[in-house]
Swiss-Prot record:
Pfam families per record: SspH (PF08141)
Key words, A-Z: Sporulation
Cellular localisation: Spore core
Disulfide bonds: none
Induction comment from the UniProt entry of this chain: Expressed only in the forespore compartment of sporulating cells.
Family per record: Belongs to the SspH family.
Annotated signal peptide: none
Protein's UniProt name: Small, acid-soluble spore protein H
Transmembrane segments: none
Organism: Bacillus velezensis (strain DSM 23117 / BGSC 10A6 / LMG 26770 / FZB42) (Bacillus amyloliquefaciens subsp. plantarum)
Length: 60
């Protein structure tokens, strides 16, 4: 996923269907310099992690 799209999703009030390793996730924050995102699985905020943006997949 590109940086701008990830930022748009993280700042939007609408939920986008994005997955990490096949698991639906919520994007909390995007780090443009490192090209990473802080994410957690939907419904499991205790499993927060930082991942590469390139590992995120948006589904339409």
């Amino acid at each position: 996923m590109n940086t701008q799209r990830a930022k748009d999703i993280s700042e939007s009030a609408a939920m986008a269907y994005v997955t990490y390793e096949g698991v639906p996730i919520y994007i909390q924050h995007v780090n443009e310099d490192k090209e990473t995102a802080r994410i957690f699985p939907i419904g499991n905020p205790q499993f927060e992690q930082e991942v590469l943006l390139s590992d995120l997949q948006e589904h339409f």
